[in-house]
Amino acid sequence: MTPVAPPGCDPGCVAVSAGTMVDAAWAGNLAGYNTIAAGFLESLRSLSVFDRLFADGAIRRIPLRTRLAVSTVATVGHEVGEGANIPVNSMAFAASGLDSRKVQALIAVTNEVLDGTTSAGAALLSTELRSGVASATDAAFLGSLLANAPTIDGSASPLADLGNLLDVVNTKGAGKPYLVVAPRTANRLTTKATTGGEQAFPGMTPNGGEIAGVPVLVSDQAPAPDSSGHGAVLIDGSAIVGDSDTVAVDASENAALQLASNPASGAQQLVSMFATNSTALLATRWFGFELIRSTGVAVLSGAHW
């Protein structure tokens, strides 16, 4: 790839193409990161709501960039007596498409760290990249699902609130409901006691579990508790179609980065990885999803659990 000057940058500043793990002549010597990339999708299962639903088979898998015809009026069957007329049904379809989305996580570490990396160090880098990709995935996934989702007022009873959510979302016998909560809400459900002092929901832990047979997932991107109370999201995985590509991990010792969590556009002060004896590690993930039934998601707010 020919280096190209970034927009708004002076002629002395050029963009450097990143080396990839599959290029032995460039960044393939960072062989340890092949292990990180290989384990990404499996490890994301416990970090990301999207990946958990995907791994469980709750989300119907459709290839990315696929044109969809979504049935909005289902056909109905009838019992027909001998010699009787057979009712004819009509259907309605809505056109949609499974567009691809991209999330990335970028970190920079010194080469001294890489050269002296132990298994614990590699695990740390893997954890940071995994967490970044998982958080960005759920931010896109839950943010899109909640944009037009119906909201239900909560109460003091988790079971009553779950029942109200199920009445909205789980309208078919083949539904695959998942309850998504924030970490503090998971803590509250885990430690909630009955009037006799016993754990109200033995299947719950701070990292998730289940309530009344419904899997509970924990995400930083779920509605956080506030002065009005706790919140939660009930998602029917069967109302979602989607797909995901493999997470790619790239490394470059020659990139020039704007070391900021909120990078600005235009000409900026860049830091050379080569000059600072550092390496940039970039995790990239392409995925997509589409809610094909508007009642497939419901939000709970103001619960006093």
List where the protein language model places each region:
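Protruding loop/beta-arch "assembly-hinge" segments enriched in small, turn-prone residues
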Residues: 2-18, 24, 49, 269-305
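Assembly/oligomerization interface modules of large self-assembling protein complexes
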Residues: 3-103, 163, 296
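A broad, low-specificity signal marking well-ordered, structured residues that form hydrophobic/aromatic
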Residues: 60, 65-66, 98, 105-107, ...
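Structured loops at beta-to-helix junctions and adjacent beta-edge loops in soluble globular domains
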Residues: 65, 69-71, 110, 182-184, ...
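Short helix/loop capping segments that flank catalytic or ligand/cofactor-binding pockets
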Residues: 70-79, 116-118, 188-191, 290-292
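Short loop/turn segments at secondary-structure transitions that flank enzyme active sites
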Residues: 74, 113, 135, 139, ...
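Alpha-helical scaffold segments that mediate packing/assembly in large oligomeric complexes
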Residues: 86-88, 93-176, 192-196, 299-300, ...
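Extended oligomerization regions of viral-like shell subunits
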Residues: 151-279, 285
